A protein has these predicted regions:
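Phosphate-binding loop/pocket of nucleotide- and phosphate-handling active sites
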Residues: 56-94
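Active-site-adjacent helical/loop segments in soluble small-molecule enzymes
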Residues: 6-66
Length: 94
């Protein structure tokens, strides 16, 4: 059964673009590397890595405390991984 989502149920938080398109701060790169190590999920530094970084910052701030369901949609970012492969070299989970 399809899920209905009303526009007023969607919140877009756009304050985590960092230095700009494809320009990551060291803090974001460290987060992406640590996230890959801990969760086994690779995030590109152009889109999804910045988005997950922002999402976790919002969780820490309590932005979703009153929410019953919160969804993070990982949209891919595969091609953004190739130029950033050195971030993931030698990573092991754990």
């Amino acid at each position: 059964e399809p899920v209905a989502i009303r526009p007023e149920e969607v919140e877009i938080i756009d304050g985590y673009v960092g230095r700009g398109y494809a320009l990551s701060r060291q803090e974001e790169l460290n987060f992406i590397r640590d996230f890959a190590r801990m969760e086994g999920v690779l995030l590109d530094p152009v889109y999804t890595g910045k988005c997950m970084y922002g999402f976790t910052q919002e969780v820490k701030k309590g932005s979703f405390a009153g929410s019953k369901n919160v969804l993070f949609l990982h949209t891919g970012g595969l091609f953004g991984l190739f130029p950033a492969r050195e971030l993931f070299t030698g990573l092991r989970k754990g």
